[in-house]
Amino acid sequence: MSKSGTKITFYEDKHFQGRHYDCDCDCADFHMYLSRCNSIRVEGGTWAVYERPNFAGYMYILPRGEYPEYQHWMGLNDRLSSCRAVHLSSGGQYKIQIFEKGDFNGQMYETTEDCPSIMEQFHMREVHSSKVLDGVWIFYELPNYRGRQYLLDKKEYRKPIDWGAASPAVQSFRRIVE
């Protein structure tokens, strides 16, 4: 485990079997060590794991825990190639603003809590811009924390491309807490 207490282990086979690769820092390309990834054990920290090298492709956020099959982290397949530790803010404060239009225009909603459905909670169909005032958050493209994930640190996001999305399809979001 690193000095910061972060550690993740990737396994080629389900249920933590087969070849494995241990990592305690950001890694832009580990697919040369493993041909596939079917299970993961996060022993310290929260991690963002990516389908392609250089932190590209589908991203999955994994807090401490065991993931015996790729479906347990909502993976689409057994391909992962890069990872990075998620650095959580100190103090445990969380606050986010979401906007119905780009560049912080239109109706704005502010919350400090997780939201399983922006349609039910805020009567919004999409999120076109956002300001993360405190904490680290995950946007999900579907309700109930499903679908593609996007990691948002403390900063301003004027349009969906700023958080890595091709469209404003955000239907739920939540805080990353340790």
Curated annotation (Swiss-Prot):
InterPro entries: Beta/Gamma-Crystallin, Beta/gamma_crystallin, G_crystallin-like. One of its GO terms (molecular function) is structural constituent of eye lens. Residues 88-93 are annotated as: Connecting peptide. Residues 2-5 are annotated as: N-terminal arm. Residues 6-44, 45-87, 94-134, 135-177 form the Beta/gamma crystallin 'Greek key' domain. The modification N-acetylserine is found at residue 2. Keywords: Acetylation, Eye lens protein, Repeat. The keyword GTP-binding does not apply. PROSITE patterns: CRYSTALLIN_BETA_GAMMA. One of its GO terms (biological process) is lens development in camera-type eye. The keyword Iron-sulfur does not apply. Belongs to the beta/gamma-crystallin family. Has a two-domain beta-structure, folded into four very similar Greek key motifs. Monomer. Crystallins are the dominant structural components of the vertebrate eye lens. This is Gamma-crystallin S. It comes from Canis lupus familiaris.
